Amino acid sequence: MPPKPSGKGQKKAGKAKGAPSTNKKRKRKRKESYGIYIYKVMKQVHPDTGISSKAMSIMNSFVNDIFERIAAEASRLAHYNKKSTITSREVQTAVRLLLPGELAKHAVSEGTKAVTKYTTSK
């Protein structure tokens, strides 16, 4: 077994001696999530119910997945019709294609309600 070198003769890579020290804290990268919105909707539906962080993570993944599917389908529809803009019509059609039966009807009515509320508030 070779002997361990002593700490005297070794040079360590690092900052130059004349460089000013920057002891500023690094900003943590923000992780975007639908968590607060999922929580608000859950409290509207079931005010006395809580949600674990693992369940919240699953719900967040679900919302991201559905969002990506709707966006991809709406994009495909716009491309088929030689349009360069995704409008509420493409999104509505994408929802009708992706979601089954009654769920699609409810999603379309809620979406229409949200768009109407947004346009009247402007």
From Swiss-Prot:
Residues 1-31 are annotated as: Disordered. Glycans are attached at residue 109. Pfam families: Histone (PF00125). The modification N,N-dimethylproline is found at residue 2. It comes from the Eukaryota. This is Histone H2B. Belongs to the histone H2B family. It is found in: Nucleus; Chromosome. It comes from Patiria pectinifera. One of its GO terms (molecular function) is protein heterodimerization activity. Core component of nucleosome. Nucleosomes wrap and compact DNA into chromatin, limiting DNA accessibility to the cellular machineries which require DNA as a template. Histones thereby play a central role in transcription regulation, DNA repair, DNA replication and chromosomal stability. DNA accessibility is regulated via a complex set of post-translational modifications of histones, also called histone code, and nucleosome remodeling. Its main location: nucleus. There is a cross-link at residue 10 (Isoglutamyl lysine isopeptide (Gln-Lys) (interchain with K-5 in histone H4)).
